């Protein structure tokens, strides 16, 4: 307790009587009292303080006179104050009032010299605070290092998780867009199928109705003829004997000769049938049920195109020599037609485009322009889809229609319904609808059409591959 009392006494001696705090930059005057330099200076600047004579003042405590020039720094007192500040920060034992200078290794706590002698610490390993401080400081620093590493890992994992969240949301959004797009394409496909089937049904209805109405009209004429004969016979029966017997044999012969011709039976069985569930769940199977084999026609190939021996692959290369200048050959662009011509029915064929960066695919009229002035648009007899680096996927309508596909088709399917005037494009791998041209009216032979780009060969797989 003596140590505590001594410390309190020194604190009182080091306290400025003006600001009542530990002195800052202490200075002493002639009488021996000390003050903060700033406090004593400000004190005598106060107009209420009376001067004894020029630059002479009274000590605030003892009223002894002193001259302002006699202020001198008290370094010894300053050092004491710093020591007191450090001592004031040190922890003391609540039970004994002594400072903690010892550390009990067994209990892991700070103790004073009196605690060390108490029964509860008897036999415990103790050491001076300054002796064990460095060791525990190193342990704490190691713990800090470990925790910082964990914090860094936590931060990395947090960033990684944030990135995963973003990636997951993007993935879900892409899938959401794909689902919407696929269903929209499927709805478009089903709508086109519905129109096609309804058109076929209407055509079948009109054909059968026409035959039935023709037969109905014939029966009307025959009914009138029979009524005329009946009336003639009834008049004879109601007349005189002479009228009845006049040309009676001829009348009877004509009557018995009248027959009701049986027309060829008109079937009421419908041929236009549609299994909607099958269309809905198996588009690819439906398309491939109309698949035909397509090969390339070398007589129409542009001079820069190289055809394989089986005529199923075409590549763009250098000008081919020894080629005729047939009017059937394309000269404006590197194009080639398929050998097969379509004049009726439904047809479907596929083109393996791979990861090529450009191509034009579709069908065209047999008599399209193949030289200067060639335009790929329906008005000129072309129904084609294009992929190019600058504009991506484009349907060559008039004007062109930009397409936004969620996945790159490696296999493109082209579907033609000649009677319905429909040309549609599909992703051959998934069956997803890509685009359908507005309804057209075909009157000429249609042929598969291909335009080949540099480093983007095209391959025509046989049906069923």
Curated annotation (Swiss-Prot):
<dbReference type="GO" id="GO:0032648">
    <property type="term" value="P:regulation of interferon-beta production"/>
</dbReference>
<dbReference type="GO" id="GO:0003713">
    <property type="term" value="F:transcription coactivator activity"/>
</dbReference>
<dbReference type="GO" id="GO:0061630">
    <property type="term" value="F:ubiquitin protein ligase activity"/>
</dbReference>
<keyword id="KW-0399">Innate immunity</keyword>
<dbReference type="InterPro" id="IPR003877">
    <property type="entry name" value="SPRY_dom"/>
</dbReference>
<dbReference type="GO" id="GO:0043123">
    <property type="term" value="P:positive regulation of canonical NF-kappaB signal transduction"/>
</dbReference>
<feature type="binding site">
    <location>
        <position position="93"/>
    </location>
    <ligand>
        <name>Zn(2+)</name>
    </ligand>
</feature>
<keyword id="KW-0833">Ubl conjugation pathway</keyword>
<dbReference type="InterPro" id="IPR003879">
    <property type="entry name" value="Butyrophylin_SPRY"/>
</dbReference>
<dbReference type="GO" id="GO:0010468">
    <property type="term" value="P:regulation of gene expression"/>
</dbReference>
<keyword id="KW-0963">Cytoplasm</keyword>
<dbReference type="GO" id="GO:0050687">
    <property type="term" value="P:negative regulation of defense response to virus"/>
</dbReference>
<keyword id="KW-0597">Phosphoprotein</keyword>
<comment type="function">
    <text>E3 ubiquitin-protein and E3 SUMO-protein ligase that acts as a regulator of innate immunity. Acts as a negative regulator of type I interferon IFN-beta production by catalyzing 'Lys-48'-linked polyubiquitination of AZI2/NAP1, leading to its degradation. Mediates 'Lys-48'-linked polyubiquitination and proteasomal degradation of the critical TLR adapter TICAM1, inhibiting TLR3-mediated type I interferon signaling.</text>
</comment>
<dbReference type="InterPro" id="IPR006574">
    <property type="entry name" value="PRY"/>
</dbReference>
<dbReference type="GO" id="GO:0046596">
    <property type="term" value="P:regulation of viral entry into host cell"/>
</dbReference>
<protein>
    <recommendedName>
        <fullName>E3 ubiquitin-protein ligase TRIM38</fullName>
        <ecNumber>2.3.2.27</ecNumber>
    </recommendedName>
</protein>
<dbReference type="Pfam" id="PF00643">
    <property type="entry name" value="zf-B_box"/>
</dbReference>
<feature type="binding site">
    <location>
        <position position="115"/>
    </location>
    <ligand>
        <name>Zn(2+)</name>
    </ligand>
</feature>
<feature type="binding site">
    <location>
        <position position="121"/>
    </location>
    <ligand>
        <name>Zn(2+)</name>
    </ligand>
</feature>
<dbReference type="Pfam" id="PF15227">
    <property type="entry name" value="zf-C3HC4_4"/>
</dbReference>
<dbReference type="InterPro" id="IPR013083">
    <property type="entry name" value="Znf_RING/FYVE/PHD"/>
</dbReference>
<feature type="zinc finger region" description="RING-type">
    <location>
        <begin position="16"/>
        <end position="63"/>
    </location>
</feature>
<dbReference type="InterPro" id="IPR050143">
    <property type="entry name" value="TRIM/RBCC"/>
</dbReference>
<keyword id="KW-0862">Zinc</keyword>
<dbReference type="GO" id="GO:0045070">
    <property type="term" value="P:positive regulation of viral genome replication"/>
</dbReference>
<dbReference type="InterPro" id="IPR043136">
    <property type="entry name" value="B30.2/SPRY_sf"/>
</dbReference>
<dbReference type="GO" id="GO:0051091">
    <property type="term" value="P:positive regulation of DNA-binding transcription factor activity"/>
</dbReference>
<keyword id="KW-0391">Immunity</keyword>
<feature type="domain" description="B30.2/SPRY">
    <location>
        <begin position="274"/>
        <end position="465"/>
    </location>
</feature>
<dbReference type="InterPro" id="IPR017907">
    <property type="entry name" value="Znf_RING_CS"/>
</dbReference>
<dbReference type="GO" id="GO:0070936">
    <property type="term" value="P:protein K48-linked ubiquitination"/>
</dbReference>
<comment type="subunit">
    <text>Interacts (via B30.2/SPRY domain) with TAB2 and TAB3.</text>
</comment>
<dbReference type="Pfam" id="PF13765">
    <property type="entry name" value="PRY"/>
</dbReference>
<feature type="modified residue" description="Phosphoserine">
    <location>
        <position position="70"/>
    </location>
</feature>
<dbReference type="GO" id="GO:0046598">
    <property type="term" value="P:positive regulation of viral entry into host cell"/>
</dbReference>
<dbReference type="InterPro" id="IPR000315">
    <property type="entry name" value="Znf_B-box"/>
</dbReference>
<dbReference type="InterPro" id="IPR035790">
    <property type="entry name" value="SPRY/PRY_TRIM38"/>
</dbReference>
<dbReference type="GO" id="GO:0016925">
    <property type="term" value="P:protein sumoylation"/>
</dbReference>
<dbReference type="GO" id="GO:0005829">
    <property type="term" value="C:cytosol"/>
</dbReference>
<keyword id="KW-0479">Metal-binding</keyword>
<comment type="pathway">
    <text>Protein modification; protein sumoylation.</text>
</comment>
């Amino acid at each position: 307790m003596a140590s505590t009392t001594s410390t309190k006494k020194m604190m009182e001696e080091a306290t400025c009587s003006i600001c009542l705090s530990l002195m800052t930059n202490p200075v002493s005057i002639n009488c021996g009292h000390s003050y903060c330099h700033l406090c004593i200076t400000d004190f005598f600047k106060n107009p209420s303080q009376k001067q004894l004579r020029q630059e002479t003042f009274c000590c605030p405590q003892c009223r002894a006179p002193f001259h302002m020039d006699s202020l001198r720094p008290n370094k010894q007192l300053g050092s004491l104050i710093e020591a007191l500040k450090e001592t004031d920060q040190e922890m003391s034992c609540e039970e004994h009032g002594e400072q903690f200078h010892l550390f009990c290794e067994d209990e892991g706590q700070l103790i004073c010299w009196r605690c060390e002698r108490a029964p509860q610490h008897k036999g415990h390993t103790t050491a001076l605070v300054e002796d064990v401080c460095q060791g525990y400081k190193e342990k704490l620093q190691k713990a800090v290092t470990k925790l910082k590493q964990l914090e860094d890992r936590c931060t990395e994992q947090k960033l990684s998780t944030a990135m995963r969240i973003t990636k997951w949301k993007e993935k879900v959004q892409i899938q959401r867009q794909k689902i919407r797009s696929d269903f929209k394409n499927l709805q478009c496909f089903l709508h086109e199928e519905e129109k096609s089937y309804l058109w076929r049904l209407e055509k079948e209805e009109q054909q059968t109705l026409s035959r039935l109405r023709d037969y109905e009209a014939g029966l009307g004429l025959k009914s009138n003829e029979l009524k005329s004969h009946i009336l003639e016979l009834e008049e004879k029966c109601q007349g005189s004997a002479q009228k009845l017997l006049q040309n009676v044999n001829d009348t009877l012969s004509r009557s018995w000769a009248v027959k009701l011709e049986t027309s060829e039976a008109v079937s009421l069985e419908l041929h236009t049938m549609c299994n909607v569930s099958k269309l809905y769940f198996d588009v690819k199977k439906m398309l491939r049920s109309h698949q035909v084999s397509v090969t390339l026609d070398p007589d129409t190939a542009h001079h820069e195109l190289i055809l394989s021996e089986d005529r199923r692959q075409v590549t763009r290369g250098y000008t081919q020599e020894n080629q005729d200048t047939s009017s059937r050959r394309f000269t404006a662009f590197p194009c080639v037609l398929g050998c097969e011509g379509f004049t009726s029915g439904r047809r479907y064929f596929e083109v393996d485009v791979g990861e090529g960066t450009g191509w034009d695919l579709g069908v065209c009229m047999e008599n399209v322009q193949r030289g200067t002035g060639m335009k790929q648009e329906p008005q000129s007899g072309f129904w084609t889809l294009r992929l190019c680096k600058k504009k991506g996927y484009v349907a060559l309508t008039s004007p062109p229609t930009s397409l936004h596909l969620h996945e790159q088709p490696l296999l493109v399917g082209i579907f033609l319904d000649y009677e319905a005037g429909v040309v549609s494009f599909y992703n051959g791998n998934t069956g997803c609808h890509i685009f359908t041209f507005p309804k057209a009216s075909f009157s000429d032979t249609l042929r598969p059409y291909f335009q080949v780009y540099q480093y983007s060969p095209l391959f025509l797989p046989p049906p069923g591959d």
